[in-house]
UniProtKB/Swiss-Prot annotation:
<comment type="subunit">
    <text>The complex is composed of two ATP-binding proteins (MalK), two transmembrane proteins (MalG and MalK) and a solute-binding protein (MalE).</text>
</comment>
<dbReference type="InterPro" id="IPR003439">
    <property type="entry name" value="ABC_transporter-like_ATP-bd"/>
</dbReference>
<dbReference type="Pfam" id="PF00005">
    <property type="entry name" value="ABC_tran"/>
</dbReference>
<dbReference type="InterPro" id="IPR012340">
    <property type="entry name" value="NA-bd_OB-fold"/>
</dbReference>
<keyword id="KW-0762">Sugar transport</keyword>
<keyword id="KW-0997">Cell inner membrane</keyword>
<keyword id="KW-0472">Membrane</keyword>
<dbReference type="InterPro" id="IPR013611">
    <property type="entry name" value="Transp-assoc_OB_typ2"/>
</dbReference>
<dbReference type="InterPro" id="IPR017871">
    <property type="entry name" value="ABC_transporter-like_CS"/>
</dbReference>
<keyword id="KW-1278">Translocase</keyword>
<feature type="domain" description="ABC transporter">
    <location>
        <begin position="4"/>
        <end position="234"/>
    </location>
</feature>
<dbReference type="GO" id="GO:0015423">
    <property type="term" value="F:ABC-type maltose transporter activity"/>
</dbReference>
<comment type="similarity">
    <text>Belongs to the ABC transporter superfamily. Maltooligosaccharide importer (TC 3.A.1.1.1) family.</text>
</comment>
<comment type="function">
    <text>Part of the ABC transporter complex MalEFGK involved in maltose/maltodextrin import. Responsible for energy coupling to the transport system.</text>
</comment>
<dbReference type="Pfam" id="PF08402">
    <property type="entry name" value="TOBE_2"/>
</dbReference>
<keyword id="KW-1003">Cell membrane</keyword>
<dbReference type="InterPro" id="IPR003593">
    <property type="entry name" value="AAA+_ATPase"/>
</dbReference>
Amino acid sequence: MASVTLKNVCKAYGDVLISKNVDLEINEGEFVVFVGPSGCGKSTLLRCIAGLEDITSGDLYIGEERMNDVEPSKRGVGMVFQSYALYPHLNLYDNMSFGLKLAKADKKEIDKRVEQAAEILQLGHLLERLPKALSGGQRQRVAIGRTLVSQPKVFLLDEPLSNLDAALRVQMRAQITKLQRQLGCTMIYVTHDQVEAMTMADKIVVLDGGFVSQVGKPLELYHYPENRFVAGFIGSPKMNFMSVQIVDVESERVQVKLSNGVTFWVPVDGTTVNKGDRMSLGVRPEHLVSSAQGDAVIDGEVMIVEKLGNETQVYLNLESADADVIYRQPDTLDVDSGDRLEIGIPAHRCHLFHSDGRACKRLFNEKGVER
């Protein structure tokens, strides 16, 4: 195990800057997930840590050692790619032991490591099979096992579940999390799927356009996003945003007016807000309530209803919203397309964002989050 530290790291291809002034501290034994949309620089950053890409400027440390000029094979990292990259003519044992054989490791040591990895990954009964005889999930476990036998100080995983179907992704998600807890290893995992990030990570790094947008525990990012990008990216379905006008301001609450003229107080830090400002009000679909329970009521035409059995998602057309407002309720809701529906907004679950995307600090204390 080892810590990983990035100090003002930048990566450029010619004049195009991909990773921009990245500062990160990843502790020993921590499971960290890099998440963000396509093209945000998350895989590039992982490849810089692995040594597959040169760092343009800044410093990378693994443990106490500066790694900028150290070749990949000597960094003590192991990498699992989106592609399984298994040798089709070799059985599982030979695939998993290939790197150790290349390094001329002792035969007994090779056998010991492969057997241990196979036991952990539940592959012991498959060691004589060729990759073509395996399922997608089993092939992915072999790829992880090949990295595991090299006993790296840091595991790097670049979108390892992207090629799997939805049900298998859920299963492998749990297995990788269990493996990391069992080994206590330092693991850095790249994904564009915020659900993977929320369910697996000790700490999430949200990337946007090469910059680190926010770093924190999953529930910190969910309940207390520092900007509108993180608020909209973390959570599924995404957060609803509505344009509001600021009517009054106090140090620990702000009065907002919706497009329908309804006003209510939102418990946020008001020190950066001015009367008359136009701002974005954010509220998550699962935090909306019935009209009787809300501090403010909005109504709109029902456009789409998704009845999933365990929950219902309703898409409402609302003039003041940036897109259809999504209302999410457990169980089945008796509503159909074309109906008018009133829903309530609970003030204490609301977020408030400046025009430049900065969030006002929320003052309501959510369960499960240390502040």
